[in-house]
């Protein structure tokens, strides 16, 4: 085994070592600070066999079809936690089943949560008076767009909410939220 002489080993000066240490520390801090930003723009998808997000109640418990229909009547529109945790309306259709689509409850004007007014049979925003029909289509401004749609699927009694990327059936246009 041969040993290298001291003249064959490159020397690192104190200044070069401190520069590398400072650069390495600054790079580590910058990457650590960028992680939440990257995670915001590319969030992890929550589980569900078919790629959907499990709809959750106000306590964060997964919703089941049988449990939901036992406590909600036909025509009911109630809030659940949907995609990205956004408030989403599950609709019980007139046949007594859960509708095939849900509505994101965030007003397209300034982001207020839009409550369902069963007396007026429409969604009315409390912030600036925007109104949406039973399917979430804007009928009175200042909201410029209809409420976002989401697919609602049932898999093994679990209620799943999935991204809607097809044509918006209310306007026959591409979805603005996709």
Swiss-Prot record:
Cofactor(s) needed for function: [2Fe-2S] cluster
NCBIfam families: Cytb6fFeSPetC, PRK13474.1
Enzyme Commission code: 7.1.1.6
Misc. comment: The Rieske iron-sulfur protein is a high potential 2Fe-2S protein.
Superkingdom in the source lineage: Bacteria
Positions in coiled-coil regions: none
GO cellular component terms attached to this protein's record: plasma membrane-derived thylakoid membrane
GO molecular function: 2 iron, 2 sulfur cluster binding; electron transporter, transferring electrons within cytochrome b6/f complex of photosystem II activity; metal ion binding; monooxygenase activity; oxidoreductase activity, acting on paired donors, with incorporation or reduction of molecular oxygen; plastoquinol--plastocyanin reductase activity
Function: Component of the cytochrome b6-f complex, which mediates electron transfer between photosystem II (PSII) and photosystem I (PSI), cyclic electron flow around PSI, and state transitions.
TM region positions: 20-42
Primary localization: membrane
Keyword Translocase assigned: yes
S-S bridge residues: 112-127
Record protein name field: Cytochrome b6-f complex iron-sulfur subunit
Membrane-topology descriptor: Single-pass membrane protein
Reactions catalysed: 2 oxidized [plastocyanin] + a plastoquinol + 2 H(+)(in) = 2 reduced [plastocyanin] + a plastoquinone + 4 H(+)(out)
Assigned keywords, A-Z: 2Fe-2S, Disulfide bond, Electron transport, Iron, Iron-sulfur, Membrane, Metal-binding, Thylakoid, Translocase, Transmembrane, Transmembrane helix, Transport
PROSITE patterns cross-referenced by the UniProt entry: RIESKE (PS51296), TAT (PS51318)
Residues that hold [2Fe-2S] cluster according to the record: 107, 109, 125, 128
Cofactor details (free text): Binds 1 [2Fe-2S] cluster per subunit.
Entry's family note: Belongs to the Rieske iron-sulfur protein family.
Location(s), subcellular: Cellular thylakoid membrane
Database matches in CDD domains: Rieske_cytochrome_b6f
Domain Rieske: 65-161
GO BP terms in the entry: photosynthesis
SUPFAM superfamilies (alphabetical): ISP domain
């Amino acid at each position: 085994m041969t040993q290298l002489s001291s003249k064959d080993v490159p020397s690192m000066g104190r200044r070069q070592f401190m520069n590398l240490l400072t650069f390495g520390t600054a790079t580590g801090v910058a990457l650590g600070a960028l992680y939440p930003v990257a995670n915001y723009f590319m969030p992890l998808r929550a589980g569900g066999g078919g790629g959907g997000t499990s709809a959750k109640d106000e306590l964060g418990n997964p919703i089941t079809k049988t449990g939901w229909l036992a406590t909600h009547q036909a025509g009911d529109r109630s809030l659940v936690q949907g995609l990205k945790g956004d408030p989403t309306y599950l609709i019980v259709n007139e046949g007594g089943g859960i509708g095939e689509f849900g509505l994101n409850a965030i007003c397209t004007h300034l982001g207020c949560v839009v409550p369902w007014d069963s007396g007026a049979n429409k969604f009315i925003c409390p912030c600036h008076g925007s109104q949406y029909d039973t399917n979430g289509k804007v009928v009175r401004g200042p909201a410029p767009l209809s409420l976002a749609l989401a697919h609602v699927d049932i898999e093994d009694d679990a209620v799943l909410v999935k991204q809607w990327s097809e044509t918006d059936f209310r306007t026959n246009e591409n979805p603005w939220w996709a």
